[in-house]
């Protein structure tokens, strides 16, 4: 049985594929998650995160951008965008506690991104979580 951490990792992979131009990923997300042994409650959790991010992607990007300071959102790598979008979605639109979300995103950054990415993710998501003190937004 997959853990929530594994489910989040699979969601980041789906978001990465979507950001890279694979529009078909929406249609096959469920089967891809099942191939990764994400089933039952974790499958429902992963699909709710994936679909939630896609449904609110413009709003999520608008939440992230003010916290980037000297960075241009469009110039971020696809993996960094995927992790930030997942983290921002969970911070803004789910009841999961912010420290848990930020820690999970840092760990995903260690797994999937460049060596300096976890510090970057921590700074952005921490700043965002402090701004969004009332949860959830939806």
UniProtKB/Swiss-Prot annotation:
Organism lineage: Bacteria, Pseudomonadati, Campylobacterota, Epsilonproteobacteria, Campylobacterales
InterPro entries assigned to the protein according to its UniProt record, in alphabetical order: NusB-like_sf, NusB_fam, NusB_RsmB_TIM44
Gene: nusB
Gene3D superfamilies: NusB-like
One example GO MF annotation: RNA binding
Family named by the database record: Belongs to the NusB family.
Function field: Involved in transcription antitermination. Required for transcription of ribosomal RNA (rRNA) genes. Binds specifically to the boxA antiterminator sequence of the ribosomal RNA (rrn) operons.
GO CC terms, sorted: cytosol
Biological process according to GO: DNA-templated transcription termination; transcription antitermination
UniProt protein name: Transcription antitermination protein NusB
Keywords linked to the UniProt accession: RNA-binding, Transcription, Transcription antitermination, Transcription regulation
CDD domains according to UniProt: Terminator_NusB
């Amino acid at each position: 049985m997959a853990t929530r951490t594994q489910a989040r990792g699979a969601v980041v992979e789906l978001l990465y594929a979507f950001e890279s131009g694979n529009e078909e990923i929406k249609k096959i997300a469920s089967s891809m998650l099942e191939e990764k042994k994400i089933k039952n409650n974790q499958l429902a959790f992963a699909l709710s995160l994936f679909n939630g991010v896609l449904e609110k992607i413009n709003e999520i990007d608008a939440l992230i951008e003010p916290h980037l300071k000297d960075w241009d959102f469009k110039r971020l790598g696809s993996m960094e965008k995927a992790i930030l979008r997942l983290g921002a979605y969970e911070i803004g639109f789910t009841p999961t506690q912010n420290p848990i979300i930020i820690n999970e995103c840092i760990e995903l950054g260690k797994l999937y991104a460049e060596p300096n990415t976890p510090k970057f993710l921590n700074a952005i998501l921490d700043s965002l979580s402090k701004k969004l003190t009332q949860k959830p937004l939806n």
